[in-house]
Amino acid sequence: MEEEKHGWQAIAAKKKQIQRALIRQYATCETQTTQGENPNRPAGVAAFGELTEKLSRGELSCEDVVKEQICSLTEILFDNAISRAKQLDKYFQEHRRPVGPLHGIPVTLKDQFDVAGFDSTIGYVGRAFNPATRDSALVEMLRSLGAIIMAKTNLPQSIMWCETENPLWGLTVNPLHSGYTPGGSTGGESALLASGASILGWGTDIGGSVRIPAHMMGLYGFKPSSARLPYRGVPVSTEGQEHVPSSIGPLARSLDGIHTAFKSLIELKPWDFDARCAAIPWREDIYQETSKRPLVIGVLFDDGVVRPHPPITRVLHFAVDALRAAGHHIVDWNAQLHAECVQLMDRFYKVDGGEDIREAVKAGGEPFIEHVQKLVDCGDPISVFQYWQLNRRKWELQQQYLEKWNAMRCAKNNRPVDVVIMPPMSHTSVPHRSCRWVGYTKVWNVLDYPALVIPAGNVCAQDIGASWSFESRNSLDEWNKKLWDNCKEVMASLQLPVGVQIIGRRYADEAVLAAGKVIDDVLRASA
């Protein structure tokens, strides 16, 4: 007989019981197995563009697409999704046109975006059974574009980590190997997308939480400048802080999904939905101009703190060689100011002495996961005056980095640098609870620069024997070296994905997406 659970464990057990009961309703989805019965059934339609085309022509029904996606999902808005799909199919039958550019596209959300009638737990037991009364601005906008909200996905306790684990829902695993992480904090999304169980996912990024999972799972992930997309109705730990704002961003298995989703949302004028959004329209002229000429690309191989593993460096060298061969100009970038930006970010994380997260965990009574325990045990809160000095230093660093970027020019044509490319992390996916250093992504949150991750390669057998002998710079560098030595054979056997990160100036989101398309096309053609 199962032992009766009490306190936070009873709450978690009840949530999972409800979840599993709802899943069982769809455990055996209706599929058309008769050969030739429907050649356009959605099975195998992985590309975002192919799916939108078939839906817009009426070759697929929204209901069929949703039912097929449900077969692989674990979070539960299924009844609502089927109902919405039927509404969209009826609209198409009556009007012979789609509702919008995301008509019928199944969408999943990190368990942070409010959906009326459903919890937004953000990994806390104390937020369970407290459903939102209103959709978040993003959900309102996605629905108006024709998207179908399918599910909400797992994230770490407090959100503030690059792996995905909490006492309420448990540990999210990598579909390639259950002993490895899919990244975080948007790890539920990356695991679903990599499994083929979602078409378009949405997460948030305050230190790499969209880009790291994309890198680890071979996906596309975009962190826009923070004020481009609406944060209204998206609860978060340390809510109210403005020193390093979090960004909302998409993940997908294709870049056209990222581009279409972001552009379509901007064209809905997010500033009419959220007072914090900048009134910057979609600038097609910037996108087209960037797309049609040779790019000046800065490249940074090493942030000076933690050396990347051999496959990370090899893949970036491959990208640089391919881009140079395609006629683009490469400029050596440096890591000046990066370490100080990361150190400042770490201080910002701790300004309240861990009070916000401590109180949220206390409300549910669950234990802290190890990383969160360390975060809340970070010391005492600082004074308002001390906090102001940190913000002053942030502005100084942002100005210094702007001047650094302005000073970097291509020696051949004196053009400024369009984008910088660099690793998203020092390693690929790793065994659970092994991540330590996120400086390769975090720096761009301090600066609030847009950053895109694209898949660029995989760990392979030749990486195992690569020369990688050096004296460690610090304890983090030593940890990273041991991680490679201990895991390289498994990483190679799994052919773990490796991404490349593409960064642009603040608010140059259209230029980053355009450069991303150019770079992605070059890499695909050179593979």
Task: Briefly describe each language-model feature range.
Residues 1-90, 325-327, 477-479, 491-492, ...:
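An N-terminal boundary/leader segment
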Residues 101-248, 300-302, 351, 420-435, ...:
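Short glycine/serine-rich loop/turn segments
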